[in-house]
Each structure stands twice: as structure tokens, then as C-alpha cells.
């Protein structure tokens, strides 16, 4: 079985609404409230422990590190979200190397988010992913050097 990855952004509501002001949101279904509660990911993210048998990456950051995976023109690059927060300037911008080009990202610390700047969003796919998952689906990707 092969999974298809889907480019996406995980950003604050304020950031999204500023860029897409006509966005509407579907409400939660009240009859599924108990199901939503049981499916909360809090337990998974509460510790660094991996809760199932799976090969762990032999390199890079801890398995549950939040990463941004960038893909374009046959290049795949991982960027650690913690690292982006560290290097972002006071306006929330960070620059990383993706293949032979420099890519500008918009970063927030609280909550921790990162997205491609407008000039790169059309030509580069990005997705937020945990290191353990990302390394498994894209083992050829390199770790960015900001």
C-alpha cells in the first residue's frame, strides 16, 4: 500500500482568515461529541515515547519532533519547527535552504506554526509532519541547514 501525501498548511486562524477572508467553517456535529473526545491526540503528544512497534529513524531529531516537509522539482527537505522558531527574526520570517534555492517561511511561536511565504507557496509543496512519519515516507529527504 502506498499513501499519497497532501500539501497543507497548519496555521493560526488569524493568519488563515487574513489571507482567505471569505473562508467559512463547518460546525462540529453534536451527535459525535463523545467520539471527538475519545479521539483526542493528547495521549500521543503528552510524551516523547513511541506507543507502537515501528522502526525509528537512525538519524536526525527525536522521533516526535514537529517538522515541515518541503517538496519541489525532485527535492525533498525537512525543517524542524523548533529550529525555525529559533532562527525566525522579529517579524516571524526564517530562511532555509531547499535544494539550490533559499526559501522564506512565515513562523509563529505561540502556537508553533510555519508556512511558506507567498512567493514560494505556488511552486513548493509543504506539509507539517512528525519526524518518525516523515522519515518513513520520505527517506531520501535531507535535513535543512538554515
Enumerate the predicted regions with their spans.
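Mid-to-C-terminal functional-domain signal that highlights helix-capping/loop sites
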Residues: 1-146
